[in-house]
Amino acid sequence: MTPMDALKGKTWNLVQFDDGSPVQAGRPITAVFEEGRISGSGGCNRYSASAASASPGALHVGAISATKMACMGPAGTNEQRYFAALEKAEGYALEEGKLTLSPGKMTFKATTP
């Protein structure tokens, strides 16, 4: 069993940024954890990156590769903000069905595919 096993098998939907602002309706931002990887939607573009955890609660996300669809307005701003925060992630916490990535305190709720 690896430290990130509890994150796998679910689609994590971003529900709130660190400042409490919600994600734009109709433009879901998602994260799916697989062995050594994270992928999902930034709201406009699909992305993937390496992801590793040396111990429970620790997280390292590598450089993000994403499709290059044009993304204007609030959706584009949210996507850029999400990608920047995701690349800086150093830890995670699971509590009552919610995933929080930090620093940056992005909060996700899980759905099963």
Question: Which residues make up each language-model segment?
Answer:
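Lipid interaction determinants
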Residues: 1-113
